[in-house]
């Protein structure tokens, strides 16, 4: 909401006071009828409105709104405040927080949540109130015997808690899509272990492509009859590396005479391999 007095504020003005500042420079000034440093906190009885109506009553703020409000007693001779509103009630949550200034106890902060309906079956909402009151407020109001007024002024900060449900849900969806994409990429690749290096080959390739992979290792070694396949045919290891050194050396001299039968032996796995017809035997 654009504040009614925003034109009187300097450019870039932000109102984010600390708990101590709210007590010492705003609530205390209001309680003693002194002008506040900035007059942007209106005087409104917040219990006469539902919380979603209050932003329209605020002087300043987009995500949180401040108000000076009185508090009335729930019972004539009691000290409990009346928390009832138009269509619900405010319920205290957590423990009160003591506020100090220069190691001196100066105020109390209480957190409340708005519930729709009547207690004890009210429906919890996302509207939150932080209520600030002076530490000596009880001693002042105790003199007002017979009056329903409990406090002349307390300071309230009201805001709506952000709903993170949709954000978390979107993060899960994006994570699932990323996992599905990774699985699809893995299924379209074949992992070949031929020594210290591991590489992945596409399912469809030509024999000329294999011959160009000089970094892959010895082609005849890979095409030998001593390769061991697992049950899925994806991982291949040379069983007799020691005994076949001479054989491998001899086969390296005949690389150009590789036939399509050897190629079929090398790619003997469940998914068919498409070999460039140029290299098929005539």
Curated annotation (Swiss-Prot):
Keywords: Coiled coil, DNA-binding, Nucleus, Transcription, Transcription regulation
GO terms for MF: sequence-specific DNA binding
Portion annotated as DNA-binding: 106-167
Subcellular location(s) of the protein: Nucleus
Transcription as UniProt keyword: yes
InterPro entries for this protein: NAC-dom, NAC_dom_sf
Pfam families in the cross-refs: NAM
Entry domain remark: The NAC domain includes a DNA binding domain and a dimerization domain.
Name of the protein in question: NAC domain-containing protein 1
Gene: NAP1
């Amino acid at each position: 909401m654009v504040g009614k007095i925003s034109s009187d504020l300097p450019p870039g003005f932000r109102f984010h006071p600390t708990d101590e500042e709210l007590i010492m420079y705003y609530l205390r000034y209001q309680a003693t009828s002194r002008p506040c440093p900035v007059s942007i906190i209106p005087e409104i009885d917040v219990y006469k409105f539902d919380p979603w109506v209050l932003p329209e009553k605020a002087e300043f703020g987009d995500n949180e709104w401040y108000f000076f409000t009185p508090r009335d007693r729930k019972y004539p001779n009691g000290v409990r405040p009346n928390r009832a509103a138009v269509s619900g009630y405010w319920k205290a949550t957590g423990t009160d927080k003591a506020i100090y200034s220069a190691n001196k106890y100066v105020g109390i902060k209480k957190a409340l949540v708005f519930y729709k309906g009547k207690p004890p079956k009210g429906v919890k909402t996302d509207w939150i109130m932080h209520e600030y009151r002076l530490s000596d407020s009880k001693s002042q109001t105790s003199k007002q015997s017979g009056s329903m007024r409990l406090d002349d002024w307390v300071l309230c900060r009201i805001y709506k808690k952000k709903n993170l449900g949709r954000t978390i849900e979107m993060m899960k969806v994006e994570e699932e899509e990323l996992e599905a994409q990774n699985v699809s990429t893995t299924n379209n690749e074949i992992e070949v272990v031929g020594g210290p290096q591991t590489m992945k080959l596409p399912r469809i390739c030509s024999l000329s492509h294999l011959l160009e992979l000089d970094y892959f290792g010895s082609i005849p070694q890979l095409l030998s009859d001593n390769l061991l396949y697992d049950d899925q045919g994806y991982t291949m290891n040379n069983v007799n590396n020691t005994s076949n050194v001479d054989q491998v050396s001899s086969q390296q001299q005949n690389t150009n005479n590789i036939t399509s039968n050897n190629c079929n032996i090398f790619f003997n796995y469940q998914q068919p391999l498409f070999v460039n017809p140029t290299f098929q035997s005539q």
